[in-house]
A protein has these predicted regions:
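Periplasmic-binding protein-like
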Residues: 42-45, 93-105, 122-125
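Structural motif
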Residues: 75-89
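Glycine-rich, charge-decorated loop segments at or immediately adjacent to ligand/cofactor-binding or catalytic sites
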Residues: 6-13, 82-84, 130-139
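An alpha-beta-alpha
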Residues: 18-64, 165-183
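Hydrophobic alpha-helical segments within soluble ligand-binding/sensing domains
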Residues: 3-41, 140-161
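Hinge/cleft segment of the Venus flytrap/periplasmic-binding protein
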Residues: 155-199
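Venus flytrap/periplasmic-binding-protein-like
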Residues: 1-8, 111-133
Length: 199
């Protein structure tokens, strides 16, 4: 998708297949609407060096704008300018969205140390980031994704399937989760259909 393939059907046609950890981006925008219906501005915080993050924030931005939010990009180039950019996002946003971004995943403490004192909730692209700095997520299970990947590999090794005929697979299910510590600190009431992250 980051390569501009609009009609990708999951088949590469060569000796490549596997699984994708792409989250349900439209539905992630939906949980922002569900949890923060009165918010006006959403800051999209991501690393500009990660093409996967750019794709995610572009998609979420389009969905959020359809829901009536004003969105701004807050891109940082690496961990050295994350704090400065995050502070700008916190100063100007009612809510911050962070995709499944590797740089943020490795620096959630920086994000939390800025956003939580500022009273700005972070909705994350997956549970690992949420556990460090987010209030909620609609996340895949990397365990379940690993099981799916293993089953694909088994089919190839046993000769049941040919790799070039196997479409890319996606996570079989997603879970609404919340971080009880951050939710309590920010005074946010979470609906009953969210599962408390116990990491």
């Amino acid at each position: 998708m980051a390569l501009g393939i609009d009609d990708f059907d999951g088949l590469v046609g060569t000796n490549i297949s596997g699984t994708s950890d792409l989250a349900p981006l439209d539905e992630q925008a939906g949980i922002i609407k569900e949890l923060f219906p009165d918010a006006k501005t959403v800051g999209l915080l991501y690393c500009s060096a990660e093409a996967n993050s750019q794709y995610q924030v572009d998609t979420v931005k389009a969905s959020l704008e359809e829901l009536g939010y004003t969105c701004e990009y807050y891109a940082f180039s690496d961990s050295n300018d994350l704090a400065t950019v995050c502070q700008s996002a916190a100063d100007a946003s009612d809510v911050i969205y962070v995709p499944t971004d590797n740089t943020v995943a490795n620096n959630t403490e920086i994000v939390n140390n800025i956003c939580q004192p500022a009273g700005v909730p972070v909705v994350a692209g997956e549970e690992g980031i949420m556990s460090g700095c987010g209030v909620a997520t609609l996340s895949i299970s990397y365990y379940d994704l690993g099981v799916a990947t293993g089953k694909m590999a088994a089919k190839i090794l046993t000769g049941e399937s040919k790799v070039e005929e196997m479409p890319i697979e996606y996570a079989p299910q997603f879970t609404k989760e919340y971080n009880p510590t951050i939710a309590e600190a920010l005074g946010i009431t979470i609906p009953d259909d969210y599962v408390a992250y116990e990491g």
